[in-house]
Amino acid sequence: IIAGINISNTFKLLKTITNNDVLTIEINSKEFMDIEITSESKKTSTKFQLKLLDINESRIEVPDVNMTSVTILPSADFQRLCRDMSNIGNDIEITRAGKELRLRCEGDFANQETSIECPDESPEMTGLYSLRYLNIFTKATSMCSSVQIMQEEGNRFLILKYNVANLGELKFYMATKVPEDQ
């Protein structure tokens, strides 16, 4: 089944989930996705009907890519950094080199660079990404305590991977921005 959902709206509904709640997702029509959150301890059940987006249903195959660098950060810290940097600029430069991850942005009134020490070595790779979309993706923070920032040597894209308890994983793929002069 291919279903188009607005990630931002979906997270607005799912952020009420607690650790012991049961989440049920069903798609019975092309217009709505039914979401039910059940709490045994509170003896409550909340139902939502999320409107589905009308999308092109052709399948897009994501190629297998060897991700050269995997950096694990607390998801709340990464979300805060992205949110803070979006107050300064529109784009973030993510560089992994050696045992360091650097997050950098430039704006009209200020620049920011944050360096994070990493436990393992990595070849140098840099990519430029939209903070607008990263801030949407980091809304998955409420579902997972850590995020894996995955980069590949070709710098074609970035993957943010959230392992959601024993339910599975969320992966967000983001294309690297190409500078306007190229």
For each predicted feature, which ranges?
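DNA polymerase processivity clamps
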Residues: I1-T46, S69-Q182
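Short, recurring structural edge motifs at helix starts
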Residues: P63-T68
